[in-house]
């Protein structure tokens, strides 16, 4: 069974990648989508590109089902940009793993400078074990089967994630949702669903999924679809 098939068997519906709202313009502008840090121009990099302690500059870091909100919060605190302060989470179709090679890590890939990263993606189900060596807390009995034992576990996707595999954009409030909508209209791309889910951008989701629950994700209604 391939790593892709193992994730599908656990009903994993998506990968997640967070980025600054201002970066979304670069991502939506071309079919290349999300580009690995090593290929990004220096002037468009931000804190989560620069601080790549895992050394995997040719890979795009993603998490499974929900974002690494702990690292996201750290990135927000470390960000010296006082003008462009908003972040979003991109939802990635699992089918990207059919066209891109990948590695995985049972924890944050930067832990111990990447020592926990594994190249044999067929063994990705290890991240769902009752216990993983790099994480002190065991898996809870009610935990959603699609979520890894350590919420910071990662899938590293080679080179880039083409725009066609971005299936959703999660934001923290209505104001950001409207700006994301405006970006999509400006670039004239097919509608990518937008969800408002503050619990997903915080670490609140972690406690929920350990009890078998999901945080609420409210669909943003495109203005032209709202009945007057």
Per-range role (PLM):
Residues 1-61, 67-228:
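Active-site-proximal loop/hinge segments that shape catalytic or ion-binding/gating pockets
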């Amino acid at each position: 069974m391939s790593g892709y098939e193992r994730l599908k068997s656990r009903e994993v519906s998506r990968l997640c990648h967070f980025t600054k709202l201002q970066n979304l313009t670069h991502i939506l502008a071309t079919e290349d989508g999300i580009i690995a840090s090593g290929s990004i121009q220096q002037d468009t990099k931000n804190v989560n590109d620069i601080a790549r302690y895992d050394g995997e500059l040719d890979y795009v870091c993603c998490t499974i089902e929900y974002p690494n909100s702990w690292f996201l919060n750290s990135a927000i605190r470390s960000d010296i940009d006082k003008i462009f302060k908003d972040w979003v989470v991109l939802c990635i179709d699992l089918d990207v793993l059919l066209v891109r090679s990948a590695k995985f890590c049972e924890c944050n890939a930067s832990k111990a400078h990447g020592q926990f990263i594994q190249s044999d993606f067929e063994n990705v189900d290890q991240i769902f074990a009752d216990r993983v060596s790099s994480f002190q807390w065991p898996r809870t009995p009610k935990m959603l089967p699609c979520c890894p034992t350590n919420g910071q576990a990662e899938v590293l996707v080679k080179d880039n994630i083409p725009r066609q595999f971005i299936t959703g954009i999660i934001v923290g409030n209505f104001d950001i949702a409207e700006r994301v909508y405006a970006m999509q209209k400006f670039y004239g791309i097919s509608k990518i669903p937008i969800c408002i889910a503050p619990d997903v951008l915080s670490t609140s989701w972690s406690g929920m999924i350990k009890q078998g629950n999901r945080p609420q994700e409210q669909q943003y209604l495109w203005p032209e679809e709202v009945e007057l």
